[in-house]
Regions:
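Interhelical loop and adjacent transmembrane-helix boundary motif
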Residues: 7-13, 43, 58-66, 208-258, ...
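Membrane-interfacial helix termini and adjacent extracytoplasmic/periplasmic loops
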Residues: 3-7, 46, 50, 55, ...
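Transmembrane alpha-helices
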Residues: 19-20, 25-32, 148, 155-167, ...
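C-terminal transmembrane helix and the adjacent membrane-cytosol boundary/short C-terminal tail
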Residues: 2-19, 159-174, 180-189, 242-274
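Short membrane-interfacial helix/loop motifs at transmembrane-helix boundaries
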Residues: 30-65, 215-220, 274
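Loop-to-helix entry region at the N-terminal start of transmembrane alpha-helices
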Residues: 69-76, 128-153, 157, 193-195, ...
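Transmembrane-helix boundary motif in ABC transporter permease subunits
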Residues: 2-10, 79-111, 128, 167-170, ...
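Hydrophobic alpha-helical transmembrane segments of multipass integral membrane proteins
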Residues: 26, 68, 72, 76-88, ...
Length: 274
């Protein structure tokens, strides 16, 4: 909020900073804003100006066997990878947060390294690992590697939630006769659930949008929606791709709104514990 006691220089800085932030935001979302109208264009090319309004490309998307197979594959791979990432990421976060052992920082760096290692390197390494096993073009390898890419997000969000967790609640449950598993299920898990779900949503979005690893590990029968879009751009540029992209944007917006709701709920739980 602009204070009436600001000097002229402070006012200039105040407005300049907001204009700069607005320009950066516009730069980031402009490609998205450009592609959405094209998905409703009646013309057969991804060009402006629009020739008219039409839902033809959405009809073509849902009527195409290739696009539906890609969508089905994404619906298979992303939830499965999310479940694996959520389970292993949560367990790793609990162990790294509560444990105190030599090399803890190194272990943390290793488990979150998929976030910083170039995805193409992960794709090549995964192919070289799974191909000799006969799993180069399989859902199994695709799900496992997508889960590996999602685990760091779960670890980070769950670890952040555990930082404000009151361990006295677990001790109180143990003093009342609860086993460690019961205490985790009835006390710990409900309180860290916002962090777990937030990490799971990040892992799901990562898997659902991933294309580089999929190019290395998926055959034609395992092609996901992003890979189908990539192939379409290279082979047959059609506004159907814009329709698919718009659906992905809508899905991403829903995920962001869900994450924002979970963030608010997590803040309320942390305040209540304090």
């Amino acid at each position: 909020m602009l204070s009436p006691y600001m000097s002229p220089i402070e006012r200039v800085w105040f407005y300049s900073l907001r204009i700069l932030c607005g320009l950066i935001l516009l730069f980031l979302i402009l490609p998205v804003l450009v592609i959405i109208p094209l998905s409703f264009n009646s013309g057969s090319f991804l060009v402006y100006p629009l020739q008219g309004f039409s839902l033809q490309w959405y009809h073509d998307f849902f009527a195409s066997a290739e696009w539906m197979r890609a969508l089905k594959n994404s619906i298979i791979v992303a939830p499965a990878a999310t479940v694996l990432a959520m389970v292993f990421g949560t367990l790793a976060a609990i162990g790294l947060t509560r444990g105190d052992f030599p090399g803890k920082a190194l272990v943390m760096a290793l488990v979150i390294s998929p976030m910083v290692v170039p995805v193409v390197i992960i794709g090549v390494a995964s192919y070289l690992f799974f191909a000799p096993l006969g799993l180069g073009n399989s859902f199994f390898s695709l799900i496992v590697v997508h889960a590996v890419l999602g685990v760091p997000f779960v670890i980070i969000t769950v670890s952040a939630t555990l930082q404000g967790f009151n361990q006295n609640l677990v001790r109180a449950a143990a003093s009342l006769g609860a086993s460690p598993l019961t205490a985790f299920r009835r006390v710990t898990l409900p309180l860290i659930a916002p962090g777990v779900i937030s990490g799971a949503l990040f892992a799901f979005a990562t898997s659902f949008d991933e294309v580089v690893v999929t190019l290395f590990l998926a055959g034609p029968e395992q092609a996901t929606l992003p890979r189908q879009m990539f192939s379409g751009i290279r082979e047959n540029l059609s506004p159907t791709i814009a329709a698919a992209a718009t659906l992905l944007v809508a899905f991403s917006v829903i995920l962001l709104l869900t994450l924002e709701w979970l963030r608010g709920r997590s803040e309320k739980l942390r305040t209540a514990q304090a």
